């Protein structure tokens, strides 16, 4: 890590922490560095990310509080703190409503979490969030998660035909090999789909329709 990259460590230990806080003590915009270091650690070192974000909010945050709430949500997801993750995602959406210039991916990551965890009491809320933010869809991975979350929820609600259609659209997005951006062709592509989310989508997309009957002699 170079001298100018002290705020985006991908790992964490006592030595890295000492350097980080030494640099932070001399930095002017401390909240910016805390937020961005938490971003880098949200999945790999979620406990550290949460601690940094606590300091960020203690200092009053900044205009990009939506991002801070978002990284907090991702850290809780990594720790399997599902209820805390939902609350953090909701804080993101509330902040985005208040300050719409700063957007995150909470509008599809929250519904994905709700769908994966089969949080049936929150299905209507998940669909509301998806529909409200459909115009925000940009990257293949967003299309994959948006249609995929809707597919899983509709399937749980017994709307099998609609779920099948959404699942197929999600899987088509997973096949995309270009982001649509000339200078960033690989940005926002779908990675590995061999997880619970992807497996459930494939099951929904390929499930035989019970209404069809074939005549055999």
At which residue positions do the language-model features occur?
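Alpha-helical scaffold segments of alpha-solenoid architecture
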Residues: 104-119, 164, 170, 174
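TPR repeat positional signature
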Residues: 34, 69, 107-110, 147
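Residue at a conserved register position within TPR or TPR-like alpha-solenoid repeats
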Residues: 41, 76, 114-117, 154
């Amino acid at each position: 890590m170079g001298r100018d990259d002290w705020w985006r460590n991908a790992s964490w230990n006592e030595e890295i922490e000492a350097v980080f806080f030494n640099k932070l003590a001399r930095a002017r915009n401390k909240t910016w560095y805390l937020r961005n270091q938490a971003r880098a650690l949200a999945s790999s070192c979620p406990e550290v990310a949460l601690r940094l974000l606590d300091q960020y909010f203690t200092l009053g945050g900044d205009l990009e509080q939506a991002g801070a709430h978002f990284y907090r949500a991702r850290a809780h997801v990594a720790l399997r703190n599902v209820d805390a993750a939902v609350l953090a995602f909701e804080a993101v959406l509330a902040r985005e409503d208040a300050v719409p210039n700063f957007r995150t991916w909470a509008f599809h990551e929250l519904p994905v979490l709700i769908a994966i965890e089969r949080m049936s009491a929150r299905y209507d809320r998940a669909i509301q969030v998806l529909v409200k933010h459909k115009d925000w869809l940009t990257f293949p991975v967003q299309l994959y998660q948006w249609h995929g979350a809707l597919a899983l929820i509709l399937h749980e609600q017994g709307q099998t035909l609609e779920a099948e259609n959404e699942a197929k659209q999600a899987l088509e997005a997973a096949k995309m090999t270009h982001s649509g951006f000339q200078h960033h062709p690989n940005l926002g592509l779908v990675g590995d789909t061999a997880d619970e989310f992807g497996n459930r989508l494939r099951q929904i997309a390929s499930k035989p329709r019970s209404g069809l009957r074939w005549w055999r002699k």
